[in-house]
Swiss-Prot record:
Region (Interaction with UBC2): 92-196
UniProt organism field: Nicotiana tabacum
UniProt DNA-binding region: 26-83
Domain description: The AP2/ERF domain binds specifically to the 5'-GCCGCC-3' motif. The affinity of this binding is higher if the seventh amino-acid of this domain is basic. Contains a slightly degenerated ERF-associated amphiphilic repression (EAR) motif, which may be involved in the activity of transcriptional repression.
Keyword ATP-binding found: no
Family affiliation: Belongs to the ethylene-response factor family. Class 2 subfamily.
Biological processes, Gene Ontology terms: defense response; ethylene-activated signaling pathway
Bias-annotated ranges (Polar residues): 1-11
Domain of life of the native organism: Eukaryota
Protein's recorded name: Ethylene-responsive transcription factor 4
Subunit structure: Interacts with UBC2.
Keywords of this entry: DNA-binding, Ethylene signaling pathway, Nucleus, Plant defense, Repressor, Transcription, Transcription regulation, Ubl conjugation
Length: 225
């Protein structure tokens, strides 16, 4: 924006400027006529000649006419008296447009809420047997929401009964096995499971129970026991 302050009705005396009048603004490509009107003209860069734009009542009107012609000749990089209408738009204008579009019903899709309850998330994986986990690529650990049944042997050792877990699909059922009698010291002590070759390996804590001792209370105790 080329604006110069020009002193009207100024008198030069001894190299000093005597300001009798009022300062007025001088615009690029605008000249003031002696009768008070303002003429606007611009140089055509192609023809290397001046182009007459007209005479206007105010300097601002003449300056705007020059700016319009300058943008036509030199494009957006032309030197003008006033900024272009696009440059006048402040950054808040775009934000105002976005906010108004949001009020009209155009909203961005909301983000899915973040799951913070890991117990519930992993529990759902245990309930479906890990199928969803394998499909989605997630890694989960089985959470036993249903407490397994606990039994206690005569020696006080607890035993977990996995039947309740098999029903929920958390633990895979083992293959059927055969039961054969087992002899101990010539006495049929009971039956014991014999896992077949096709069955899955299940580690079981086997307990022999109390070992029977053949003693005669009428006789003296042995020397070594």
């Amino acid at each position: 924006m080329a604006v110069k302050n020009k002193v009207s009705n100024g008198n030069l005396k001894g190299g000093n400027v005597k300001t009798d009048g009022v300062k007025e603004v001088h615009y690029r490509g605008v000249r003031k006529r002696p009768w008070g009107r303002y003429a606007a003209e611009i140089r055509d860069p192609g023809k290397k000649s001046r182009v007459w734009l007209g005479t206007f009542d105010t300097a601002e009107e003449a300056a705007k006419a020059y700016d319009t012609a300058a943008r036509e000749f030199r494009g957006p990089k032309a030197k003008t008296n006033f900024p272009s209408p696009t440059e006048n738009q402040s950054p808040s204008h775009s934000s105002t447009v976005e906010s108004s579009s949001g009020e009209n019903g155009v909203h961005a899709p909301p983000h899915a809420p973040l799951e913070l309850d890991l117990t519930r998330r992993l529990g759902s994986v245990a309930a479906d047997g890990g199928d969803n986990c394998r499909r989605s690529g997630e890694v989960g650990y089985p959470i036993f929401h249903q407490q397994p049944t606990v039994a206690v042997l005569p020696n006080g050792q607890p035993v977990l009964l996995f039947d309740s877990l098999w029903r929920a699909g958390v633990v895979n059922r083992p293959q059927p096995y055969h039961v054969t009698p087992m002899g101990f010291n010539g006495v049929n002590a009971g039956v014991g499971p014999t896992v077949s070759d096709s069955s899955s390996a299940v580690e079981e804590n086997q307990y022999d129970g109390k070992r029977g001792i053949d003693l005669d209370l009428n006789l003296a105790p042995p020397m070594e026991f």
